[in-house]
Amino acid sequence: MENRTNFFHLHLISDSTGETLISAGRAASAQFRSAQPIEHVYPLIRNRKQLLPVLQAIDDAPGIVLYTIVDRELANLIDERCVEMGVASVNVLEPVMNAFQIYLGAPSRRRVGAQHVMNAGYFARIEALNFTMDHDDGQMPDDYNDADVVIIGISRTSKTPTSIYLANRGIKTANIPIVYGVPLPESLLAATKPLIVCLIATTDRISQVRENRVLGTTQGFDREHYTDRATISEELKYARSLCARHGWPLIDVTRRSIEETAAAIVALRPKLR
């Protein structure tokens, strides 16, 4: 019998760096060996304007929603919209805060990011997170020389979650999709400061993740082309040729966790440690 991994969308919404939430989500998902989350991480969500696109992304790719949002109005909006979408939502901190309030006999201050010491390291992480979110999926290409790391790769090679993981460690990270036959931005080729690294995986792995992506989204896809193994092999071949031409390192993420991939990237540039 085929031992097939089932993928699901895990949406993680935080009003701070998201580290607490990511740890909780991974601890829970690790208990289910046959299922693997496709993580969508949304840090620094602190107002309605920032939250609305996140809710749309959840509607496009339904799954499980975990959040650490102390603002009651935003938390209520998440819960209401998730009910409308038929999606499970969990306020991870609320049961803990309620237990503290009952035991201590005092209400919480509900201060955003209260668990973080406001030191230079914290502000560096916030700056890196802002940079990384602004430069996700090829956005703002003129700023690539301000990045510490630029991650490239074809679709479904964990570029965004790896970028956010690095940003949580104060590393400014941009990521760019490699699209077969489409040249990379000139601003990337001209960049001299950042470490540029390409993420790859096996054809079977990418096809499987893409199939689950298509099944779990309402967006329009040319499913046959997107998940076709021959097409993916050509995309990987194209990515490898770009890296060979420019001397960029490749990291195979097939059997690596996000943490292991990030560690492999940092190992390529010791000054990032």
From Swiss-Prot:
ADP binds at G153, I154, S155, R156, T157, S158, K159, T160. It is an enzyme of class 2 (transferase). It catalyses: N(tele)-phospho-L-histidyl/L-threonyl-[pyruvate, phosphate dikinase] + ADP = N(tele)-phospho-L-histidyl/O-phospho-L-threonyl-[pyruvate, phosphate dikinase] + AMP + H(+); N(tele)-phospho-L-histidyl/O-phospho-L-threonyl-[pyruvate, phosphate dikinase] + phosphate + H(+) = N(tele)-phospho-L-histidyl/L-threonyl-[pyruvate, phosphate dikinase] + diphosphate. GO terms for molecular function: ADP binding; ATP binding; phosphotransferase activity, phosphate group as acceptor; protein serine/threonine kinase activity. Signal peptide: none annotated. Transmembrane segments: none annotated. Its EC number is 2.7.11.32, 2.7.4.27. Keywords: Kinase, Nucleotide-binding, Serine/threonine-protein kinase, Transferase. The keyword Kinase applies. Disulfide bonds: none annotated. The keyword Glycoprotein does not apply. InterPro entries: Kinase-pyrophosphorylase, PPDK_reg. Belongs to the pyruvate, phosphate/water dikinase regulatory protein family. PDRP subfamily. Bifunctional serine/threonine kinase and phosphorylase involved in the regulation of the pyruvate, phosphate dikinase (PPDK) by catalyzing its phosphorylation/dephosphorylation. This is Putative pyruvate, phosphate dikinase regulatory protein. It comes from Rhizobium etli (strain ATCC 51251 / DSM 11541 / JCM 21823 / NBRC 15573 / CFN 42).
